[in-house]
From Swiss-Prot:
One matching Pfam family: Tim17
Protein's job: Essential component of the TIM23 complex, a complex that mediates the translocation of transit peptide-containing proteins across the mitochondrial inner membrane.
Subcellular location: Mitochondrion inner membrane
Species in which this protein is naturally found: Neurospora crassa (strain ATCC 24698 / 74-OR23-1A / CBS 708.71 / DSM 1257 / FGSC 987)
GO BP term (any one): protein import into mitochondrial matrix
Membrane topology type: Multi-pass membrane protein
Description of how the protein assembles with itself and partners: Component of the TIM23 complex, at least composed of tim23, tim17, tim50 and tim21. The complex interacts with the tim44 component of the PAM complex.
Transmembrane segments: 10-30, 57-74, 87-107, 112-132
One MF term in the entry's GO annotations: protein transmembrane transporter activity
GO CC annotations on file: TIM23 mitochondrial import inner membrane translocase complex
Protein name: Mitochondrial import inner membrane translocase subunit tim17
Principal localisation: mitochondrion
Length: 155
């Protein structure tokens, strides 16, 4: 069991805040550029600021909800699996998160959202494992050369 991480309630809050910040910052950049480009020539700065104020907080909230739900499901799955740490936790948490976020759209939307999110998390986990194995192979230590033998000295 990993004792270096915070307990699950704090991990959930931390992940929610981090996801909200990522969404708000990304939304500021995205909607700022979009508002700037779609405004008339003399009002581009005002158009960018207006677009940021209208849309960036909503995008931050959407990212925050996703991060909070994912972290909640991840902690719940770890608890159900006796605190086992492996990629299946993230894949299952992604499955439940995608399904929960799409459940208002009906059964098919929930199913497709769950499968899509699980596949996305499986790809992310697979790439992470691949990079770990690739980088671990580059750091293997070579055995040192044996010391010279003393046969000539004894003869």
């Amino acid at each position: 069991m990993d004792h270096t991480r915070d307990p699950c309630p704090w991990v959930i809050l931390n992940d929610f805040g981090g996801a909200f910040a990522m969404g708000a910052i990304g939304g500021t950049i995205w909607h700022g550029i979009k508002g700037f480009r779609n405004s008339p020539y003399g009002e581009r700065r005002i158009g960018a600021i207006t677009a940021i104020k209208m849309r960036a907080p909503a995008l931050g909230g959407n990212f925050g909800v996703w991060g909070g739900l994912f972290s909640t499901f991840d902690c719940a799955i770890k608890g159900l699996r006796n605190h086992k740490e492996d990629p299946w936790n993230s894949i299952l948490a992604g499955f439940f998160t995608g399904g929960a976020l799409a459940v208002r759209g009906g059964y098919k939307a929930a199913r497709n959202g769950a499968i899509g999110c699980a596949v996305l998390l499986a790809v992310i986990e697979g790439v992470g494992i691949g990079f770990q194995k690739m980088l671990a192979g580059a750091t293997k230590l070579e055995a040192p050369a044996p010391p010279p033998s003393n046969e000539k000295v004894l003869a």
